């Protein structure tokens, strides 16, 4: 029987995340950034009020530049001024929530989105999901990684000088600027 209920989809996502978190290959943890299953469960509970939306139950991630209320937007930096938790959501988070989707992760990136490789001296380099000796591209590296590895159906990044297009091309997924 194929159960496509919101609850089933979300349970499968949490089950999959638990498997990813313990992978020997640490590149996924480096790409995910600030997320754990209790956070995912909390975000799912918050979003159940929009269970009728066209994207109900769809998990997605955002680059660590986007504000998610209650979570720090670190810009993949360790500077203390970036440790404060956001007091409101970015517009894309609000809109996706209205549509019923659930933000389940903030992804790794080049520090301050300044780079095209996926390298980060503080949180580790975001490796290519299939070619372990290669990088995923940047600066929206974690977003491309999660979609290319088929962990999430979509993820949001930012693009000024190729920061979506390069990692999408390097990882073999579609990236829309």
Q: Can you say where each PLM-predicted feature lies in the sequence?
A:
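Short glycine/serine-rich loop segments
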Residues: 89-90, 94-177
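Short, well-ordered alpha-helical
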Residues: 1-85, 113-115
């Amino acid at each position: 029987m194929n159960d496509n209920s919101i609850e089933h989809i979300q349970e499968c996502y949490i089950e999959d995340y638990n498997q990813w978190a313990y992978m020997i290959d640490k590149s996924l943890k480096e790409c995910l950034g600030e997320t754990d299953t209790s956070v995912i469960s909390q975000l799912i509970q918050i979003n159940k009020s929009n269970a009728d939306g066209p994207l109900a139950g769809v998990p997605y991630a955002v680059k660590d530049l986007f504000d998610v209320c209650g979570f720090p937007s670190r810009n993949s930096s360790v500077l203390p001024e970036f440790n404060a938790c956001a007091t409101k959501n970015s517009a894309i988070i609000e809109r996706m929530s209205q549509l019923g989707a659930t933000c389940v992760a903030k992804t790794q990136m080049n520090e301050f989105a300044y780079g095209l490789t996926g390298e980060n001296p503080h949180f580790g380099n975001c490796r290519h999901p299939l070619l372990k000796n290669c990088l995923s591209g940047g600066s929206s590296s974690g977003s491309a990684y999660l979609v290319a590895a088929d962990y999430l159906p979509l993820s949001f990044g930012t693009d000024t000088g190729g920061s979506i297009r390069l990692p999408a091309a390097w990882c073999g997924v579609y990236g829309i600027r």
